[in-house]
């Protein structure tokens, strides 16, 4: 189980990403459309002025059951240990253990 403070930090990051997504996208579109280097520099400074945790690449995928940051399967949102345990218990519909 991950520390509650780490899980809370990730929740806060997700909220910030959602809050600033539109503003960040519009600034990035302006940045890519600008031809003048000075104009690009000015827009880049505006992007840098946004909160650091509002960047989507700062968000880490975590297991929703345990909060573990590693070995998380995107399809289920579970870490490998929880995925195995829940699959054996039959809690994941459609998931079948392979045999050949």
UniProtKB/Swiss-Prot annotation:
Pfam families: Ribosomal_S14. SUPFAM superfamilies: Glucocorticoid receptor-like (DNA-binding domain). It comes from the Bacteria. Part of the 30S ribosomal subunit. Contacts proteins S3 and S10. Belongs to the universal ribosomal protein uS14 family. Binds 16S rRNA, required for the assembly of 30S particles and may also be responsible for determining the conformation of the 16S rRNA at the A site. This is Small ribosomal subunit protein uS14. It comes from Prochlorococcus marinus (strain MIT 9301).
